[in-house]
Amino acid sequence: MAGGLPHPVLLSTFMGMDEITIGGQVVEFKHVFYSWVCMAILFAVAWVLRRRLTLVPGGLQNFFEAMVDTIENFIVSTMGENGRKFVPLLAGIFIYIFGMNLMGLVPGFDAPTANLNTTVCMALFVLVFYNAVGLIRWKTHYIHHFTGPSKFLIPLMFPLEVVSHLSRPVSLSLRLFGNIRGEEIVMVLFFIMAPILGTLPIYALFLLGKTMQAFVFFMLTMFYIKGALEAPEH
């Protein structure tokens, strides 16, 4: 399966485990099930790496340490020292979305991000989180992010800012869903039109696209948090 589409190589690996029957109605929850599968895989990898930590890193430890250091340096260079406390969250968002994106490349699995429900939930979490960060940091003064520098501009600025903030989860969710879903459809078409071995090189292109979509979501989340931490105009 791939985003609800028949997978070109295998049927769903966990056929029958991604749906339940309630009152005679079949309710599918592939996106939830495969999100849990992704979390389980990431937790398992983290647990194995934690047990094998050494003072002289090698192999996977070296790779993951380099990746985390790169992400941390990027966040701190963009947000300043205030951003260091958000490294676990932002790095987790990137790795989690990247992992869910990659599941669409594995025969028999779905990419949860090819389902709009998943991306909407992620985007709504970002909306609530960065506004909560702003409220905690600036208390009631955070409202000035929405009203502008002058009280005379409130009737104009407030509705514009509200619409602007509400459009962020819409943009985040539709961008991620549309790109991943589109890639899943194109991948199915490639496998239909050509032999399996002949289409394997296209996986590199899909891998790049899925990486970029996770990075874009991560970047925008970081900038939204950074904006909430900035001093509001009075």
UniProtKB/Swiss-Prot annotation:
Keywords: ATP synthesis, Cell inner membrane, Cell membrane, CF(0), Hydrogen ion transport, Ion transport, Membrane, Transmembrane, Transmembrane helix, Transport. GO terms for biological process: proton motive force-driven plasma membrane ATP synthesis. The keyword Mitochondrion does not apply. It comes from Desulfovibrio desulfuricans (strain ATCC 27774 / DSM 6949 / MB). Signal peptide: none annotated. It is a multi-pass membrane protein. It is found in: Cell inner membrane. It comes from the Bacteria. This is ATP synthase subunit a. GO terms for molecular function: proton-transporting ATP synthase activity, rotational mechanism. Pfam families: ATP-synt_A. Belongs to the ATPase A chain family. Gene3D superfamilies: ATP synthase, F0 complex, subunit A. Key component of the proton channel; it plays a direct role in the translocation of protons across the membrane. F-type ATPases have 2 components, CF(1) - the catalytic core - and CF(0) - the membrane proton channel. CF(1) has five subunits: alpha(3), beta(3), gamma(1), delta(1), epsilon(1). CF(0) has three main subunits: a(1), b(2) and c(9-12). The alpha and beta chains form an alternating ring which encloses part of the gamma chain. CF(1) is attached to CF(0) by a central stalk formed by the gamma and epsilon chains, while a peripheral stalk is formed by the delta and b chains. The chain crosses the membrane at residues 29-49, 86-106, 116-136, 188-208, 212-232. One of its GO terms (cellular component) is plasma membrane.
